[in-house]
Curated annotation (Swiss-Prot):
This is DNA replication licensing factor MCM7. It is an enzyme of class 3 (hydrolase). Its EC number is 3.6.4.12. GO terms for biological process: DNA replication initiation; pollen development; regulation of DNA-templated DNA replication; sugar mediated signaling pathway. Probable component of the MCM2-7 complex (MCM complex) that may function as a DNA helicase and which is essential to undergo a single round of replication initiation and elongation per cell cycle in eukaryotic cells. Required for megagametophyte and embryo development.
Length: 716
């Protein structure tokens, strides 16, 4: 079998890089090479989809490239060396430039030097790295599908990143200086382990019959950034009864720091064997471990701050922003298969959007994340809502209370396999940093484990002092918890405090504690049954009157909204302060208060109002935002207020009148607008139809007069 002509392949690579044009007719790769020459970028990513679509390229060349990828990385690098244009912009010289200039002055950069050890390797001259991105045709492989036949080939693998090491320097070219003859000696390093030179291989030392003394010159040597990551199979790819498999991924150069634990990603890379080292090598025999040398990383769900909008997405977001009913459309697009819970879905939408974080001049931080606890009877779709929110959020971690220890939620001290040092391994709350942590069965957690959440929910850090490590980790996460009442179902004969059975210190940290009670109601149960049957028959939700938004559009809209930092205007200060004090007064009057109101409640009102302003793409909070925030807080306990009214013997019409009268007296008004009256009674769970009935009944009694056009109220 004759040797393959790799020089011919280098010519093909040069032709592709030189002549390939994108859809706009621009020389894509020559523009990238110009930016590399100007030292603006270091990575040259060759997309094999471009190579597949290139008219002058044969399928055999693409096949050879994917089956012997490491060799073709060096072939493309050699082609880039020949094609690299002259820089068009000035840039300051770094240490590497100074060394290369000095070598040129000394004449040591001459490639015709007879001694191969004194020839400067091409690798040390390069400022760039060449990466291949695998063709996007077909679905990515799972870890289980990558076998021994794929060794040396370019593969695409999807999975979730479970851990990442620190970024360390990895030697690519070792440079020595001989103390006896003064020559520079170069040693290319192709693996993570190498044997340093102890004898000078130069011709002068050999002629003088001397061993020489090569001294390693670290500043002249070339190092690459190196990071090791562990990737695990996604849950949906694991067969029944099996445990998820994992794979080691090596990231070099510009690919480091691209992933973090918890990210769902797709790696393109070269599947390679690596021999065991140390004591493992004694027992391994002919068995080798495997790893993936990554050449590209693609995130399935981009972080909000990394989101780059496509033109069509920008147009769609602009159209949605102009829609007056966007708040309802976005909330109803969350889990449309789940019947009802409209207000809960609105609250969960606001949890996804959040409020801006505030940092005061003295360094004090005020959190912007909204925490929500869903507490209710079994079978009201709490867990389904949690899982759906985790799917929509770009970064989310789902865990259960009984299956999570305090260490599993915060951080554990472990020994790093790469460096053998004691390192911190982040728990669920740390993995969900800048995202959402959903904790199901919150009431089943041990009290000692639950205390780990207190610091995270307010200070948004995890403080650790164990195994000689004293540090603080960021956990800027929104906590979404689901719990059952103390006796499995809510017992109306007991007080809310007895039913909820969570400490006040924890309850006050939740912006919204939503009680979902499963009450028997003929009409509601009939509608629910029809909805569930429709979903089972058609595997899709019933018609909503509009097309529900896809999760990627939801993420794009929320990403655009999160870039705003709305402020509270001065004219709303009095209004918010009055609303907060009235909540405190109502709670003080009640024999069995339904909520635990502290100053944190005031901050919760501000956070929810700011999230609503973000949804409107507004730079300032409006009164309507504050009213909606207060309404959501009231609606979260609405089922309990209905019981209070029944116990007090009040009918809906009388109670509606009492609410309007008390609010008008508090604000010292004799003239009340219809919008204000509707807002006041909706906070208490009454409908617009009940308001109209109340207005007519009390107008007939001459208690007030109603404007025939605007329906505004004037007390007599």
């Amino acid at each position: 079998m004759k040797d393959h002509d790799f020089d011919g392949d280098k010519g093909l690579a040069k032709g592709f890089l030189e002549n390939f044009a994108d859809a706009n007719g621009r020389s894509k790769y020559m523009e990238i090479l110009q930016e590399v020459s100007n030292r603006k970028i270091r990575a040259i990513q060759v997309d094999l989809d471009d190579l597949f679509n290139y008219k002058d390229e044969s399928e055999e060349f693409l096949g050879r490239l994917t089956e012997n990828t490491r060799r073709y990385v060096s072939i493309f690098s050699a082609a880039v060396d020949e094609l690299l244009p002259e820089p068009t912009e000035a840039f300051p010289d770094d240490d590497h430039d100074i060394l290369m200039t000095q070598r040129a002055d000394d004449g040591t950069d001459n490639p015709d030097v007879s001694d191969p050890h004194q020839q400067i390797p091409s690798e040390i001259k390069r400022y760039y790295e060449v990466y291949f991105k695998a063709p996007s045709k077909g679905r990515p492989s799972t870890i289980r599908e990558v076998k021994a036949s794929h060794i040396g080939q370019l593969v695409r693998i999807s999975g979730i990143v479970t851990r990442c090491s620190d970024v360390k320097p990895l030697m690519a070219v070792a440079v020595y200086t001989c103390e006896d003859c003064g020559h520079e000696i170069y040693q290319e390093v192709t693996s993570r382990v190498f044997m340093p030179l102890f004898k000078c291989p130069s011709s002068r030392c050999r002629l003088n019959s001397k061993a020489g003394n090569p001294i390693l010159q670290l500043r002249a040597s070339k190092f690459l950034k190196f990071q090791e990551a562990k990737m695990q199979e996604l849950a949906e790819h694991v067969p029944k009864g099996h445990i998820p498999r994992s794979m080691t991924v090596h990231l070099r150069g510009e690919l480091t720091r691209k992933v973090s634990p918890g990210d769902v990603v797709e790696f393109s890379g070269i599947f390679l064997p690596i021999p065991y080292t140390g004591f493992k090598a004694l027992r391994a025999g002919l068995v080798a471990d495997t790893y993936l040398e990554a050449t590209s990383v693609t995130h399935f769900k981009k972080k909000y701050e990394e989101y780059e909008f496509q033109k069509d997405e920008e147009e769609q977001i602009a159209r949605l922003a102009e829609d007056g009913d966007i708040y309802n459309k976005l909330s109803r697009s969350l889990a449309p298969e789940i019947y009802g819970h409209e207000d809960i879905k609105k609250a969960l939408l606001l949890l996804l959007v959040g409020a801006p974080h505030r940092q005061l001049k003295d360094g004090m931080k005020i959190r912007g994340d909204v925490h929500i606890c869903l507490m209710g009877d079994p079978g009201v779709a709490k867990s389904q809502l949690l899982k759906h929110i985790i799917n929509v959020a770009p970064r989310g971690v789902y865990t259960t209370g009984k299956g999570s220890s305090g260490v599993g939620l915060t951080a554990a001290v472990m020994r790093d396999q790469v460096t053998n040092e004691m390192v911190l391994e982040g728990g669920a709350l740390v993995l969900a940093d800048m995202g959402i942590c959903a904790i199901d069965e919150f009431d089943k957690m041990d009290e000692s484990d639950r205390t780990a959440i207190h610091e995270v929910m307010e200070q948004q850090t995890v403080s650790i002092a164990k195994a000689g490590i004293t540090t603080s980790l960021n956990a800027r996460t929104a906590v979404l918890a689901a719990a059952n009442p103390a006796w499995g179902r809510y017992d109306l004969r007991r007080t809310p405090a007895e039913n909820i059975n969570l400490p006040p210190a924890l309850l006050s940290r939740f912006d919204l504690l939503w009680l979902i009670l499963d009450r028997a109601d003929m009409d509601s149960d009939l509608e629910l049954a029809k909805h569930v049957l429709h979903v089972h028959q058609t595997e899709e939700s019933p018609a909503l009157g509009f097309e529900p938004l896809e999760p990627n559009i939801l993420r794009a809209y929320i990403s655009a909204a999160r870039r705003l930092s709305p402020y509270v205007p001065a004219e709303l200060e009095e209004y918010i302060a009055t609303a907060y004090s009235s909540i405190r007064q109502e709670e003080a009057k009640s024999n069995t208060p339904h909520s635990y109101t502290t100053v944190r409640t005031l901050l919760s009102i501000l956070r929810i109002s700011a999230a609503l302003a973000r949804l409107r793409f507004s730079e300032s909070v409006a009164q309507s935002d504050v009213d909606e925030a207060l309404r959501l807080m009231q609606m979260s306990k609405i089922s309990l207020y209905a019981d209070d009214r029944q116990k007090a013997g009040l009918d809906a019409i009388s109670d509606t009148y009492s609410i309007i009268r008390d609010e008008a007296a508090r604000s010292k008004k004799t003239h009340v607008s219809y919008a204000n009256a509707l807002n006041w009674i909706s906070r208490k769970g009454y409908s617009e139809a009940q308001l109209k009935e109340c207005l007519e009944e009390y107008a007939a009694l001459n208690v007030w007069q109603i404007d025939p056009h605007t329906f505004d109220i004037r007390f007599i």
